């Protein structure tokens, strides 16, 4: 066995080695390369197909293989690659060759003249075949690139060490694949030639001639194919000669300004080339080569070019033009930037012919690939994406050479530069020597440390200093004078002084320096050191830290000494070229020989350390201090800034620019809807101010083409061949999508219609298969919903069709002009020819029929019809004015009040039926009020819609005729009716007589029956079962008996007539058929045990069967009853157990228990679900568990459940202690202090676990002290307090409502539907879906078991909700969960019998979102006409509504419960945009429970539709973040994100008014508790504090911020331009917001959006009308124009719009290249708490009242955000502070955080000394018994080693990331201190 396993293991390892070997992998990839067939194969196939002889075939194959071999070699041999890859070589060689090839006629055999039979290799045509195949194989990679090839070549490159072996093996693999391919081709051709069926000569007689013709034209076919291929590729790649030259920011725009800007700006606008490859001029044609060339040192030797501004200059050129560039060399700070940007004045004077020819023809910086230009609209250029994120280099570590991926790029760069310019004479030590050296140095360090420690210990013991200090022998000059040599040159002195220099004044270091002359120093260093070190490494930015120049000079001096000492030969070589007169013999190293004067030394240093900058304005020379330049990595950027057409239009508005835009954006047309000329400024209603501009302002809408946008922001002139593979599955989609994310996209698109249609088809089939009729009838609401869905689908389909037609018109050339002219023609025809002629004809006809003519009415209607010209998408302009460019852009003609010809005008009233609904009439009227004209003269509802049905002219006439005929008939047939009645009477008489006869016969038969007793069986009644009887037979199983007995009779015994026999036989057959039918149905049906329908009549006298049936029925009833009552039995059983245990365990009197239970009555009420089970259409299977507390409550307080039919599903596993105490922890402490005695008992309980008891104690849930003291509700545990400060965790109800799909939410709502919709105050304290033990009883029907992908969303949302609920449950009673709805309490007071504190009616902590408090304990009156099932409110609109003081809420509400106008005071805090107010409980009148939330009854239309489709909630980028931004964005350092101009000027006044208000409240309310008073005071203080802290309250500060943050040059230009115009504050503000933060898109809510657009369409028309009253009134009546939207005043500031909810800030996905710091910031961001949250945290933590004066003293401490009071400790992020949310982990973590000792959790009393206010110490469990410093160090050291498991399990969405790969916590090696200034 051992041997076998050993052999097997060896075999496996051998196989693995073989598979992973370079040769095998090379073969594999080479074989794969075969499949990327390119155009080069055309020549190879041509040689085979044409049958030109084996020689040509051989030469073609040889050329093909040679070309491929060259390609493989060129991948690894840089010179060959550069030669092939340069754009100009390819262009120069390829274009002439292609032309020659295509226009060389094949039948003129140019190359055959030299052919001899001796040697066919001399035949030029064969050589040409070889050349063709060779060259096209090269084209296959460079000119006709295939992305597959490029990627395949790159795959294995970094892993293989032996590169040539890999190249060889991959070539061999390619060869094998190629041979196989050619064999296959040969077989196919042979089969074609041999197969007779191919050349069937049924119809073609001259078959031979056809084949020969085909063979002759084959060459032409191949040439055409090749030509098409090349044209296809070359059409997509820009021609290098006519490449669109993109404007660089550096050349023109930056010119004069950039030197004024700060360092930051120059860095950001600079263009950095990513790799040396690009600097060498190779194009980005082939991405497969970038990576390899970075490593290749040979490539650097190819050329010595240095690019300045795109011009290639060799080294000699630089020496020639040295005076021109001298300044840039001296520029210490900007030298690299100047090399990149080329901001050189002299450039502009150079003539064009001085530029090299190649640079003119080929712009190496052009966008050859379809790289997407990622815009960053603030100030940066386009990002290049060729740079790696890490920098790899070898470095010694622990004595060994290892590859480091975090190597400092500066070191590597410096080394490379030095090695490039001068060969270092040092030899590399062997690895063993390195390792030994490292060990030796380590030993030395240890010895030194030990020696130092020993000496210190000796000092501590009190030994003499002279004995302890080290004694050294020194070298001195003179014995008598005791003058020593300097330490640096003392050979006897070793140790710390040896080889180091003391930093002191430069004048004192005369002896340390070297002694060349001033001239030579200057020339060497200026001309050569810069030449060595300043090669253009553009991928590094320079961060400059200023240092003291004095101390710096000594360092530089010493480094000069060292460098010159080591590299004299190299310097002499380079210096000799430029300065031959320099004498190097004068240089010496010994200080005694020659010394330079200190002033000369200073000058030398000054040349290095100072830069002489020519100021662009005054041309003066100024000195700037140099800094140590730390070379750091930066994002590589392109050198130009590209604009799209929208930006171009913006620039055109601001200044006339001749430049064309470079980025292709979506097809759009600018539709001008209104032109504001100077003369009609009075009627101007546009939102723009009319400035004194020369040209008229145009109001325009942008109309996007509905086609899919495949231009994808491509740059003009870039290549399209290698776009990402994209698919489209919709007729029109805005952007292309990758198929990877199909599962994330809403499945309503046509692409997915197939599988969904299948589901729709399957549902009814399944239902029919399972049961004939459904078990429960669907409710009306479901039917309505289904109809609505159908209607919406139909509308969507119609809309798609309309869009499709519109796009067809838009794409065909000249189609718009044709259509427009046809429309205008049809309009003229209709208005002036067709309708007048119809009116004339009608009235003449009326006169001929002796009716009154209706000239007046008809002409009035005809005059009223208006034909209004509209833009292509339907914006109305006017009757006479045509849209601008309507022949190209398109036109619509809208007919207002379309005239409809009727036979008579008074028929309208007659035709209207009495039962017709006025609403439907209104709708009809709306529809008929306008229409659009089609090109055929028809009417349609919407542009491009289907023509609507015209009301027929003759229909009313026919109806009228029918009425007349009916009347005639009525009179004519009256006689017949009388006749019919007579005949009826006669028949009735005869029937009665017949009855008497029948009865008489029956009586005789009865007498006869008495004679024959057996006939009892014969005349038994057999009833035909009715519908109910059928059901009875199903359930009672008795139906089998009677037919059997009937069937077993002996019919011959009876003397009955033949007729009766037939009747009985018929009855038997019918019964038998019914039985069979019923048994079949039984097999199909699901039995329903509780259907209990009694039969009409039992058709049998058998007593035994009857008793059996009776027993069966009784047992069935009993079992149903048992099933129904089982939960009650279980519940009572559990009650008993729990009551006994509770009463035994908690040793307090029963009275106390009763008090406890009564005091918790309010909380428990919520879990009692008083609803009936048999509500129609509601699936009751998902009812939740009733908590055991409610069972105790029922047994002790004798309360009855109001409805006995309630079904309860109970599960014992749910009632664990952890769960019980989890539930108890939600109850306010205030009500639970009586449990204190249980928790105060410090010994072990039989029942209560110590851990849970400790947890409750530390949480402050139970107060162990007496009930008369103040409860500890205000104190909180530290970790929870910390979490409370982060907006990520305070998710509002709106968010939870969006978590899961709408269908599922509807199901929840249905289940919670309130039965009594008519009662005004109905109880909505429904049972809450419990997340810890959620038993979702799935519906058993097969329909609902269809797989749904949305289950995952539900699961995620449950975890999120559980964590959210667990973290913030102390905000109120129960925060919003899962499906928890707006809870509306019945209008009654909750009893407080035992002097407990009543909760205040409105208690909202400042700065916490008000939407968190919805649905907790506040009472809402909702009007009864509104839909009571609508439980979700979208706060996106209402969020900013109440910003002004004294807003009267009453106009918003439409209530019948009385008017209460509350005065709302609101703080205008810059960051916290939440509602903050106090409503006095005693001031309201009899309706005192009617609360602030009344205004939620407003405007249902606005609220009913959610803002956007948020099903994939887990993409934070796509979600409407109004919830995140409505409160201050605490973890986002960009403070200016939501700045408002002039918004906070009156903040002090407001604070004063608020103070007055609060004091007023105090005076009015005589019943304010101490709690309330404390809250009011704290509230007041917080407001003052925020008012003082508010940095945005001063407009000057804001101006300063703006000027600091505007750094981009183009933005600066715009700003300078803006200064010329005097703009209003609002415009400045809007410009500022939009221009600076363009990655936020502003949009408004959909319903509002639609209404505003409708209004705009009407305005456009009204503005042009002379008398607009009639149209305006009719449009308001039709509901086209909305008055509430019109109420917006003229010049609205953006802030006002945002406050009113008209604009919503919706962040777009930032186009920024994420890097390490961003991920670190994402991860650690939640630890950064903004200062405005400190007071909330403090308010929750503190226990005592604090005087206001101390606050005023302590506000200065809030300047630093994360610094503690004493400013010594910094708050660090400890992941163990964040609790994990899966399963029961929260308990374990809590217990490990808070030990059982109650003293550890400190409530942090605030010290009354103002200097020591603890403003941000919430991360540590601080205590007076605990040393915080040690604790901090301990945690800092320890935490990475544990809690990682919990960290990994944490819900990753809490970190604001959208996939797990960004969870980069483990990348961070060290956690620095975080301070946000």
Curated annotation (Swiss-Prot):
Compositional bias (Acidic residues): 251-268, 281-304, 645-659
Subcellular location(s) per record: Plastid, Chloroplast inner membrane
One GO CC annotation: chloroplast inner membrane
Pfam families: Ycf1
GO BP terms, alphabetized: protein transport
Domain of life from the UniProt record: Eukaryota
Transmembrane segments: 18-38, 64-84, 87-107, 124-144, 172-192, 221-241
Chief location category: plastid
Keyword flag Signal: no
Recorded family membership: Belongs to the TIC214 family.
Protein name (database record): Protein TIC 214
